Swiss-Prot record:
GO terms for biological process: plastid membrane organization; polyprenol biosynthetic process; response to cold. Gene3D superfamilies: Decaprenyl diphosphate synthase-like (3.40.1180.10). The lineage of its organism: Eukaryota, Viridiplantae, Streptophyta, Embryophyta, Tracheophyta. PANTHER family: (2Z,6Z)-FARNESYL DIPHOSPHATE SYNTHASE CPT6, CHLOROPLASTIC, DEHYDRODOLICHYL DIPHOSPHATE SYNTHASE FAMILY MEMBER. It comes from the Eukaryota. This is (2Z,6Z)-farnesyl diphosphate synthase CPT6, chloroplastic. Signal peptide: none annotated.
Length: 285
């Protein structure tokens, strides 16, 4: 489209006809190369292709990185970048439900994030309260993974209420990782198992992969191991996230910062996953 029209409102009428502002075209109707209707068709086609594929990831984990850089690049306080948490995750959950993805795990706050400024941490804790209160009403099941006891008391109460209210919801399961670290998760699982051995509840020879996984915080999910990990923001590392569970996950890194991570970016990640051959340590033939 001509640059004259960039940033100008285009209003859709019936029959895929679009009208440009009267200051540009005198109120006449123009068919804008069907570009907008073609975009809608393309969007629907992508969703159908992905949804009809046998290679739908059951569990997608997301490291939501780049909020601070997004804000700083625009001369804004870092809090402005964090405000995209709820709307973007809501969009991701909505699209994932349509595609048939069953579990989303979002890395929202790590055990190391307490080292940030008290102003930023306090803002995030309030933001998480609002997040859980909002997601309580969305019809998805919501669970926390991570050390809840270190979180502010009010946030703990909101989380507990959200988990109780949504525990019977069918469909998508959203696991929020707050005060979470993969090393922490494995350590607390080890301590729990050691305590059970000490108390005579299990024997040493009973310890295996299955038993260990039952002590990880992700045990609340039907599919606790992610098929796909997405990291936004350009960094190519897993940053102490789901260390045990990611053993055979496909990794997808995108330069897109999380505030800009929308439907098209998520579709790109799913398409990338569907083009891969998962071998789980086996041979390629």
């Amino acid at each position: 489209m001509n640059s004259l029209f960039v940033g100008r409102p285009i209003v859709k009428s019936s029959y895929n006809v679009y009208t440009l502002p009267s200051s540009i075209c005198g109120g006449h109707f123009f068919k804008v190369s069907n570009s907008l209707s073609l975009y809608d068709d393309h969007r629907r086609t992508r969703i159908e292709i992905i949804r009809n594929s046998e290679l739908i990831p059951k569990h997608v984990a997301i490291i939501m990185d780049g909020n601070r850089r997004w804000a700083k690049a625009r001369g804004l306080p870092v809090q402005e970048g964090h405000k995209f948490l709820a709307p973007n995750l809501k969009n991701i959950c909505n699209i994932s439900s349509k595609l048939g993805i069953q579990v989303i795990t979002a890395f929202a706050f790590s055990t190391e994030n307490w080292n940030r400024s008290s102003e930023e941490v306090d803002f995030l804790m309030r933001l998480f309260e609002e997040f859980f209160e909002e997601f309580m009403r969305l019809g998805v099941r919501v669970s926390l993974i991570g050390g809840k006891s270190k979180l502010p008391t009010k946030l703990q109460q909101v989380i507990e209420l959200t988990e109780e209210v949504t525990k019977s919801n069918e469909g998508l399961h959203l696991m929020m990782a707050l005060n979470y670290g993969g090393q922490y998760d494995m350590l607390q699982a080890t301590k729990n198992i050691a305590s059970k051995v000490k108390d005579g509840l299990i024997k040493l020879e009973d310890i295996d992969y299955t038993l260990f996984e039952q002590e990880l915080t992700t045990k609340c999910a039907k599919f606790p191991k992610p098929d796909l990990l997405i990291r936004t923001g350009g960094e190519q590392r897993i940053s102490n996230f789901l260390l045990w569970q990611l053993a055979y996950s496909e990794l997808y890194f995108t330069n897109t910062l999380f505030p800009d991570f929308g439907e098209e970016a998520l579709m790109d990640a799913i398409f990338s996953f569907q083009r891969r051959h998962r071998r789980f340590g086996g041979h390629t033939y």
